[in-house]
């Protein structure tokens, strides 16, 4: 032991520093190695403090004969000389075979190397501007872009989690269904802040059974490849574990259920939201995050961007934003109707509302169906449709007067007359004058003579 101490203490700080190697594992995660000394240090969970300090978690391991294993782990501002000096002193107390001055030189070199790389950020790259095939790169068309975040928000019990689990199963199977296109099987990590594995396991099993993928042709159970992670800390504290799972399993899609629970701060605080987006961008995977509306959004049951709970930077940071609106008029206990409303789109055209119907038997989910605008127009889901689609839904079964169409839309005849006239000019509707001079509007196929004994209709 004494010989080892003598040999080590003969090594100058300069020699140890020259032996130093810094490795960037990923954004904000580094590893420093001193081969001669047998010391390895990890630096991660880096944050910018309000006072401009950079704070990080430092973990030092030793492979030396004395004190082998973990030496010390702490979180300090790595821009503070006092903190670095104190950390080096603590390391010397753990392994005195390395002089205090040598420990200080090692920690200084580690922190300086990390700070330089952290501050310079990503290198600039030249934009050629010569791309001929300009298109949106979808992971899940038309919902989630490649390596970009999508938020689906809706009130509690609207069916957000069930929809996310349905999408996750489609990804796992590489299955296109109900207008959701997935070209090949994808690896999914479901990060759950809201429930537990038992409930999520049951829900995934229900969805897989409804889609016919729970069993093979011989009736044998077929397991999914979906990864589940129970999270009970803010995203900043869960990020390292999530990243390890992403790397280990080659994850393509990260599902966050839900944003409010994952934030670990005030959703109205722009600094909290911006830090959240920065953390998610480090994962470099596509993200489907579930969120909730604000109080006004819950009262109105609408899905515009102003209904999303929290800071406007939440909307600014997302690429695709969808509101999930649940019908409040559905009387049948075995059905839930919901509509996805495209509220924000950066690089794509706005999608038409996508309606879904969850059909349940007495104990479980039985089917997931797509519903068209005409069906949505028959319930309170019509509020998410354009005036064009609401009018078409109102006259889908029979021609109606302007007042009758307006009543269907909870408007007055005066409010929609210009839209009716526009649709007649475009050929989407026909104007029909009855024998008693009432003006009615219908679909083109309705501009025909009625049954014998009825009014004679004249198409204008």
Region locations from a protein language model:
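Phosphate-binding/switch region of NTP-binding enzymes
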Residues: 151-152, 157, 161-162, 191, ...
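C-terminal regions of RecA-like/P-loop NTPase motor modules
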Residues: 1-39, 247-248, 330-460
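Short, structured interface segments
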Residues: 104-122, 363-375
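The Walker A/P-loop phosphate-binding site
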Residues: 110-207, 214
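Short gly/ser/thr-rich secondary-structure transition/capping motifs
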Residues: 130-137, 236-237, 302-305
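N-terminal nucleic-acid engagement/recognition segments and initiation subdomains in replication
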Residues: 1-116, 460
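Conserved catalytic network of the ASCE P-loop NTPase/AAA+ motor domain
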Residues: 180-183, 246-248, 280-283, 315
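Conserved inter-motif catalytic segment of the P-loop NTP-binding fold
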Residues: 32, 45-46, 183-267, 271, ...
